[in-house]
Amino acid sequence: MKYLSNKSTSIYKNGETCTTTQYDFDNKNVGFAISKINGRYPEEGYFVNEGVQELIYVLEGSGSLHKKTESVSFKKGDAVLIEKGEECYWLGNCKVVTICCPAWYESQHKMIK
């Protein structure tokens, strides 16, 4: 078992509309974070995770997740699975839990204009 308090986290400002609190369990198989999204993220274009899947659980608020060919709306209590390789963007005002498998790492996260 590994325990982390909320005092041993890293906070990342991903532009003007997204702030992420990362819990670093030092485990390459799974990652955990909480993000606050206020508006569109990314502000232009799309993001893609080339190496991880993201399971999203909505803690607060609502919004939508958009791909080039489809979109899905969500609200508190909903869950969304973003497969690796999916190009998408967020639109909303929400707080979400993100569980990544394997653990999220920066070099696989790309922005697409």
Predicted regions and their residues:
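A short glycine-rich, His/Asp/Glu-containing loop-to-beta-strand
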Residues: 9-47
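Short, conserved beta-strand element in jelly-roll/cupin
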Residues: 48-65
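Short amphipathic beta-strand/extended segments with alternating polar/hydrophobic composition
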Residues: 5-6, 33-35, 73-77
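Short acidic-glycine-tyrosine-enriched beta hairpin
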Residues: 68-85
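Double-stranded beta-helix
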Residues: 2-3, 29-31, 91-113
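Glycine-rich nucleotide phosphate-binding loop and flanking beta-alpha elements
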Residues: 88
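Short strand-coil-strand connectors
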Residues: 26, 66-70, 93
